[in-house]
Every structure is written in structure tokens, then in C-alpha cells.
Amino acid sequence: MEKRKDVRQLIIDAAEKFNNKTAFVYNDVEYSFAKLQNDVFKLANGLLNLGLRKGDKVAIYLPNCIEYAYSYYAIYSTGLVVIPIDFFLTDKEIISIGNHCELKAIITTENVKFDLKELKDAIPTLEHIITIEKNTNYHYFWDLINNSSNELADQGIDISMPSSIFYTSGVTGKPKGALWNYEHIHLGAEQMKEMGSYEKLLNIVKIDVTERSVAPIPFSHSAGLFYFTIAIKYGMSTVIMPRFAPLELVKLIKKWGATNIFMAPAMFYAVLTLKEIENYSLDTLIWATVFGAPSSPDLMMKFAKLCPNAVVLNGYGLTEVVPPLTVSSPQNIKGFSYIVSNINLKLVDSHDKEVKKGEIGEVIVKGKSVFCGYYNEPQLNEQVFKNGWFYTGDLGYFDNDNTLYLIGKSKDIIKVGGELVWAAEIEEVLLRYPGIREAAAVGVPDPLRGEVVKCYVAPADSTQLNKNDLLDYLRKNLAKFKQPKDIIILDDLPKTGPGKINKTALKELG
């Protein structure tokens, strides 16, 4: 296979090229590329000194922090396999993941709602618990750094080796482990850089040492890896947010002069609904991208007004195919007009035949950005891979200009009698109603029609929503078979860690 520089060598190169320039900012402390190399290589040796070896699985269960960045780099520099675990998950879910992947070590914090010792008792393969706080019962993260050498030998890592297992959020079912190899961890940064060569984004998306981002998305998400690989490849710096808070995000953008941001739709909406937002102009931003879930163009246009010097973009990606796959143009953020060169993408019908322009089909992809499959799930892999193509479950169509429009997931089709209802269509209509912040449509069992539509909405701050008014509104805007049997108004809709609405949790609410 082709020879490319491993993470260890990229860190060495970045320290030489960018040296004392800032790689990360955390709690107002700036961490240079030179310090990054010193500390990461010490941590890498600390992990090796524990007896961990290539192929061993090491979980990171932390909120966003500098220790998270160091852990990623150290694991990748030694040929270990990183298991980033969403910090919202419970101990039972961690135990399930740990047993599924045969976890060997975990880097975590004592600030959790369970006894860490329970993990060791419940996961037979777990040998090492490393905490970022000093505790005599566990390995201390900073002791591994302070007591180790900063000279790290080449570990002989092949790009075909497993590098990461991302346990997907389980929005529509049980979480699954998406396996990446050591080449995949480079591709996201390279595809982001490639986006900047798209003629409609020239001199806008630069991805270089002149750029700075604020990171509100969880580092456990596959998109969180962007910040780490972009830094050591291209010199872009990142301000780390421990957790998303809309006002704090705005303040950090202003304070540190961030040039770009990428977030989930719910995060953009949270910023827009801040009472204090009228006091801010995010004039340092050059580009802002929404990703991770369907978004309303109206929402993004409202955000654009806060950023007088920025273009607003829509990105499409998924954990199973190194994101981003596609990006919109600034002129049409509803459609995706640029597809990265690492993949082939087409739309097929239920008989695996490519559909014509304007016809709806399932998005299938092939290429080196496609993941290696679901870890230890051979039957599932047989279902989602056919003739080298990965079937994403996402549905869309191409217009005559070859712009891709996504309309939802195949799992989000609600079969009402003999009719097919697209949940995304109903959600889009609901989001146009004044005062609705979030909306979700799901199918629920019905003895006569098989399924019927049920909707859940969350109001904007200080807005009072009336169920009967909402039902009347939908009767005027939707065909009868698409109209929901019921609408439930909640303060907030349940989310997964990356900010997607959790429809499985909604269905469990009844």
C-alpha cells in the first residue's frame, strides 16, 4: 500500500514547521506545537510502559479537554486503537461497548456518576484505568507524561491497521462500532482541505495556519477528529470548549478571533435564541458549516446575519464514510454541489439500479473513505455492503445540475396504509411554524393503517405552543394521510451526543 507519514511523523513535522505557534487553546492556556510534541510523545511512552501494544483498544471517556487531544495523538502515535466514548453514555453502555471491543484501557475522569471500579469488574479484558485527576487507585494521566521520555521510536504502523472504533449514536437503534483504519484518520482533514479547492469556496475555506476554530462538538464524534489531524497537517489552531454552551461559544469566537465553526443544527439554533445575541457580531468568522443532521435553510440564513463576513455552508457526512462527503455552495445551502474525490456516489432504487435525475434513491458510496465495516458484526456488514458499495440508508435525488438533495433516511419512511410519508417533509413544515425550535416526526403502530404519524416539537424560549393550533396548521399544509395522529410538546427533544434528535428515545416515550 502507499506510504504516507504516520501521526508520529506529522507531529514531528508540525513542531518543526509551526514550533511556538498555537495548536490548541484550553481554559485560556495556549499549547504550542512544540509543547504538543513533547507532551504527546511522553504520554505515548507512558502508555507503552503500561504494556499496551499495537492493536490494543484504549477508550477515551472525557468531556472535551486538552487531555482528550493528547490522548488521541498518543494512541495514534503508538499503533493502538482508540475507542472514543460519548461522555453522555452511562456506565452500563460503557460496559457493553467495552465487552464488545475487548477494551484494554480507558482514559477518563473521576467526575462521573458511577464507581470506576465497576468498569474493571464488569469488563474482564480491562487492565488499566487512567484518570486525569490524581488518585492512588488508578494511573494518573499526568504522571504518565511527567515520568516518561519525550523520544518516541517509530512504531512501524501500517495504514491498513485498525485505528479507531466509533460507536454510532444509535439514533434509530442499537449503537454499532464503525471501524476505521490508519489511513482513514488522514482523509477527513484532506477532504476538508480539498473543499477549499472547490471553485465556489476558493480563498474562503483555507484550512491553514491563518485559520482558527472553536470546537463545540464532542471529540467522541468522528467529526471531532478533524481538529486533531487538521492541526498537525495544516497548522490550524483550535479553541477547545469542554461542553457546548451557546453564550460561551459566542464569547470564545470573539475573544480568540475564530475564522470558522462547524456545528449541528441544534447548536446554531441555541446561539440564535440567546437573549444577548443582538449584542454580538461574529465578524471574524469567514465560514460556518452545519453538519450531522438535516437543517433548515431558514435557520442558516438567520445565522448568516450574525456573521457579516462569512459564508454559510451545509455539509454531509456520516461516521461510516469519513466526513465530509459533500458540501453545498454558498448560493444553495439546501443542496450538495461538491462531492470529494475520495469517493464515488450514486443513487439506486430497491433493485440496486441507478435512478434517473429527479428520482429518489438510496445514497450508496465506494472508495477509500468508506469505513472497514462494523466491528464484530459480520451479518450486518453483509447487509450494508454489496459489490463493494456501502448502502448508507440515506435517501435523496439529483437535479439536472447534478446537485444532491437529501430527504431523509430510509428508516424515517413512515408507511401509512399504502402510502409512504417522509418524516423530513413533515419536520420541515413544522419548522416553518413560528415559535418551533425543534421538530421530529416518527411512525407509531396503528391497527388499521399499520403506522401513523406522531410528531414531537419543542418551543423557542418564552413561546407558548398550542396543540390544536399546530394540528390545524398541519391540516392546511399536508395531505390527509401525512397528518399526525398526535403532537407532543416538550421543553427539549432528546439528543444523542453529537446533537442529533434521538428518535428511538422519542418512540420509547410513547
Describe the role of every protein-language-model region.
Residues N49-L50, S77-D143, D461-T463:
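Structural core segment of the AMP-binding/adenylate-forming
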Residues S32-A34, S163-Q191:
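Conserved AMP-binding A3 loop
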Residues E2-R4, I12, N20-G51, D56-C65, ...:
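Conserved AMP-binding/adenylate-forming core of the ANL superfamily
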Residues H186-R212, S220-N260, L274:
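Conserved AMP-binding/adenylation subdomain of ANL enzymes
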Residues N20, T136, S149-Y167, G173-K174, ...:
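Conserved pre-ATP/AMP-binding loop-to-beta segment of ANL
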Residues K233, A258-F262, L274-I333:
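Gly/Ser/Thr-rich phosphate-binding loop
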Residues L89, I95-S96, I106-T108, I261, ...:
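AMP-binding/adenylate-forming catalytic core of the ANL superfamily
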Residues I339-N342, K353-V384, E419-V421:
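Conserved ATP/PPi-binding loop(s) of AMP-dependent carboxylate-activating enzymes
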